[in-house]
Amino acid sequence: MGKRNERTGEAERLVGEHYADVLRYCRRHAPAGLAEDAAQETFLRFVRARSRYRERGRARAYLVTIARNVCADMARDRASSWAELPEAIPGGGDPGDEDDRRDLASALARLPRAQREALELRYGEGLTVGEVGAALGMSRFAAARALSSALEALRADLDVRDEKGREV
């Protein structure tokens, strides 16, 4: 009975520490209105499969991997797509910012899926390169290559230039 209480306490601790991160990920990737369900399903799957986890890496990366699979399953079931970026940037801002945001969304959509997901996990979720690799089922080096290639493609697609007009 003591071992079971230990596992329950560990699961509760992980939920407390990582629920907000998992929910944020699910809000971006789950079909509309299903983010909370996806987050709950993520933790349910984690609890069911926790014997396979064995603290091999950071729990957050493992949970994001599960969330990614849950959201993909839900999207297939509902034939939905990713949530769109908001049309306007909160707080107003320069009207050109909206154009920039649309251009960025279009450029991101043209990237291969693995590169797009790597960028979102790294810069949107704040995962390390190693955690990105773990979440996507690739090595740290493959994740770094995917990130580098994605950034290079975005720079070329968006014609990014520095303050002196040189291509970056």
What is each stretch, according to the model?
Residues L23, F43, P112, R116, ...:
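C-terminal flanking helix
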Residues G2-R13, L23-E41, S51-R54, R140:
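Short, charged helix-capping/linker segments at alpha-helix termini
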Residues R68, A72, G130, L136-D162, ...:
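DNA-recognition helix of helix-turn-helix
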Residues D37-L44, G57-N69:
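Structural recognition of an alpha-helix C-terminal capping motif at a helix-to-coil junction
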Residues R48-E55, V64-L85, D97, V160:
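Arg/Lys-rich amphipathic alpha helix in sigma70-family domain 2
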Residues A118-R122:
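A short pre-motif secondary-structure segment
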Residues G9, S80, L85-A109:
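Acidic, proline/glycine-rich intrinsically disordered inter-domain spacer in sigma factors
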